[in-house]
Amino acid sequence: MLAGVLLLVEWRVKVHFPGMWALVSFTAAAFLLERSGSNLRFETKGSTSFVVHLAGTVLFGGLWGAVIAGCSTVLSELDQRKSAIKVLFNTSQRIVAVAGSFAIVRLLGAATPMFDFTPGVPLIVTDVQRNSLLYLLFAVLYFAFNTTAVSLVVAWSSGSRFREIWNLTFRG
């Protein structure tokens, strides 16, 4: 439900449609990275698809970054024949991580896209520095949302304490 609310919030922010080619390319890249992931503890899997999720959000904004993350996650989960509840959770968790963290940095003043390369528009150093720091915060929040959601669900489903799962997650 939170994923849907965040998508609706991001939808209300007027951001240009990046085009089907960009969305399909980013979704395919994230899907392929997800497929090449590695197995972790507690029947979880890690991948580098987050790079594409973050890049898509930096370039296209919170809505389209969340769409890329959601679509690539659904495709990957279905390809791996995961149960419906895992597909729903993993997809929602990625959408919340992208849209939620981007909503926070947008409220703090982050620009979309991060840099404006329009001919004739100068890059202002203070804007570049501010946006760089805000997008660094975006990445930190993305991982915080993601790790917290996974740790909570793994702790709940395994009967372990959240703190124990959280510590094991960071130790690898």
Residue ranges and their predicted role:
Residues 1-172:
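Short helix-perturbing small/polar motifs within transmembrane alpha-helices
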